[in-house]
Amino acid sequence: MRIEKCYFCSGPIYPGHGMMFVRNDCKVFRFCKSKCHKNFKKKRNPRKVRWTKAFRKAAGKELTVDNSFEFEKRRNEPIKYQRELWNKTIDAMKRVEEIKQKRQAKFIMNRLKKNKELQKVQDIKEVKQNIHLIRAPLAGKGKQLEEKMVQQLQEDVDMEDAP
């Protein structure tokens, strides 16, 4: 069973699904859904349409250069069936998928870390600019006045008790 890629959005196309368009020069275009086919007919660039994988890779939102992508290449050479080779291949595919997911998760976390640092710098800058909103000029004076009043009252009480 061969799973094709959509020409426009790079999504998977399973057997019996999607649409195929063959141009006069025998170039084959496969589309996973009518949305992709319509955008192709409108001559839209997949790298500029925000929901496509091409846009995500071009904008640096997804991992693009990695050795794990080499295993996904299309191979058209028929190989003689051997049970051992088949089992090893399936085990290797599982391992490669596991490694790829770890690397993608790490890439996303690194990307998010940069944004957190920028957000922190912006927050500090905003607090410095609007410090008067956070701390009123007479905020500490109220406590000082209260303490003075308490001291004066205690002194008055002490003076009255002394004679």
UniProtKB/Swiss-Prot annotation:
UniProt xrefs under Pfam families: Ribosomal_L24e
GO molecular function: structural constituent of ribosome
PROSITE patterns: RIBOSOMAL_L24E (PS01073)
Cell compartment(s), UniProt: Nucleus, Nucleolus
CC annotations in GO: nucleolus; nucleoplasm
Signal peptide positions on this chain: none
UniProt keyword terms in alphabetical order: Nucleus, Ribosome biogenesis
Keyword Membrane: no
Keyword Oxidoreductase attributed: no
First-listed, main subcellular location of the protein, grouped into a coarse class: nucleus
PANTHER family in the record: 60S RIBOSOMAL PROTEIN L24, RIBOSOME BIOGENESIS PROTEIN RLP24-RELATED
Family membership: Belongs to the eukaryotic ribosomal protein eL24 family.
Function text: Involved in the biogenesis of the 60S ribosomal subunit. Ensures the docking of GTPBP4/NOG1 to pre-60S particles.
The protein's name in its UniProt record: Probable ribosome biogenesis protein RLP24
Protein's organism: Homo sapiens
Source species taxonomy: Eukaryota, Metazoa, Chordata, Craniata, Vertebrata
Annotated gene: RSL24D1
